[in-house]
Amino acid sequence: YGQAIQTLYEKNRRYDSSNQIPMLPISLFKTEELKSIPDSEIFKVITSSGTSGVASHLYLDAFNAQNQQLALYTIVKDFIGSSRLPMLIVDTPDILKNRDAFNARGAAILGFSIFAKRKYYALKPDLSVDLESIRTFIQTYRNQPVLIFGFTFMIWQYLCEALANYPGLIDLSNAILIHGGGWKKMQDRAVSPHEYKKRLY
């Protein structure tokens, strides 16, 4: 960060407060390999979903990768508690099998899997809705809290829109939904955050 500030802005300037420190354009993570560690210490590369056309890459060493996982656990447990819950993942299990195509969706599924007592997938390999898997999930855990996880646009396109054709199939009033990423695709579909929440309720 310091090197970037020195390159882009006035060199050797002293800042008296954090309000004076310049911001960096987030697009730099898409166009440059920004690293604060040597290549030999790279433990994990986080890749964004790239819904805007170009993916960002963040390079972590083992220490910061562990801290990232601990931070995720600390934040999420405030919402769902410390117990693991049955989880319905709005994606296909195949996304974890092809390491060459591994992306932000796969990384997010792996990250949030620490909260799952048992995992079910809502989609088949061809991204069609797996009704049998969803029915099994609902019937098995009808009277207890459950967790649903997926990317924002995946939940909209493959769960909300598809299951609208099967009214009465799902009762997810006992579910906690966690979604993230993919808002660019929602904007392309002219779906506002308000409309998204309204459909889910």
Where are these regions (language model features)?
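Ser/Thr-glycine-rich phosphate-binding loops at phosphate-binding pockets of nucleotides
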Residues: 47-55, 152, 181
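Active-site diphosphate/adenylate-binding microenvironment
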Residues: 2-45, 56-58, 69, 74-80
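Conserved adenylate-forming
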Residues: 49-101, 112-113
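Glycine-rich, phosphate-binding/catalytic loops in enzymes
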Residues: 65, 106, 165-167
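Generic beta-strand structural signal
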Residues: 44, 83-88, 118-119, 144-146
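Active-site glycine/GP-rich loop and adjacent strand/helix microenvironment
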Residues: 110-201
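Phosphate-/polyanion-interacting regions in eukaryotic proteins
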Residues: 93-94, 105, 124
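Short, charged/polar "capping" segments at the starts of alpha-helices
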Residues: 3-4, 95-102, 186-187
